[in-house]
């Protein structure tokens, strides 16, 4: 079983161990992030491989809306640190290493493809603006 530690992120703090952040407020609670934000938890691991595996596990849990059940609050929903840890630990108990590594590799490729498409859309939007400005 993987060993990880989850804490509330303090702005300005740096971490020596491999880590990532998960958003804890709003409808995107549970979303893994590479860079910190004011409303997030930090998950630290021992190795980079564990960090990567947990990152994509949290991404899968977010997309599958497993964190949504634990959201509290009426105006700004949030997830508590104990609930986030409970969801992650439950998912870790159900995961098989070999199959999960294959899924992580596929998720990496999909994420890279998605970023490429977003960059292409941005370039097309700029091209459209340049074309319209050239017409005037």
Language-model segments: which ranges?
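Sequence-specific dsDNA recognition surfaces
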Residues: 1-15
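Amphipathic alpha-helical coiled-coil/heptad-repeat segments
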Residues: 95-136
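Glycine-anchored helix-breaking recognition loops at helix->coil/strand junctions
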Residues: 61-102, 116, 121
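Short coil-to-beta transition motif at edge beta-strands of beta-rich domains
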Residues: 17-20
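A short acidic, often aromatic-flanked loop/helix-cap motif at beta-alpha or helix-coil junctions
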Residues: 11-12, 51, 95-97
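Short amphipathic alpha-helical patches
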Residues: 41-45, 77-85, 90-94, 111, ...
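A short beta-sheet element
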Residues: 24-76
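A short, structural micro-pattern
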Residues: 15, 35-37, 81
